[in-house]
Amino acid sequence: MKKYADYTLPSFFGRVRPSNIWTRGVYYEGLIALYSIYPREDYYSYTYDWANFHKWGMRNGNTTRNADDQCCGQVYIDLYNMCPSDPNMIRNIKASIDMVVNTPQVNDWDWIDAIQMAMPIYAKFGKMTGEQKYYDKMWDLYSYTRNTEGEAGMYNAKEGLWWRDQDFDPPYKEPNGKNCYWSR
């Protein structure tokens, strides 16, 4: 991880960062995780500057239910937990997650990546606040994705693997007649 961050970090300085969706969110998840075990100030500063540049917000605002938009919230929460002096750091992501928590809808995660993009946010808020509602909603969203999304859920219990989304669950098969699974 260190070699990757050291190699790419300078290549992003001075560039406009127009996106606060999953494509950059997952990079910053990794960078802040690296910072937690290898605390170089430039890793923290670069991550903080990115979050601040986006005003600690998400693409499509606080009413988004889209996990791709919410992914950046994982990093915002991590930064806040390192220095919990400014509640504005998590205000937007909390508003978005609270909106989801306070509705009965559970079919938001209709592609497998959504579990990685949004699920940790619910766990982080559950731990931070001590409120069970975050864990309950996380479980409801996860269970629906696993067991119901598409025809019969996106998880193949027999093979222990996940289909990408409902377009790839049975009866879909690859040209070789096998199931098509998703991985990164």
Describe the residue ranges of each PLM region.
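Glycan-recognition and catalytic cores of secretory/periplasmic carbohydrate-active enzymes
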Residues: 1-184
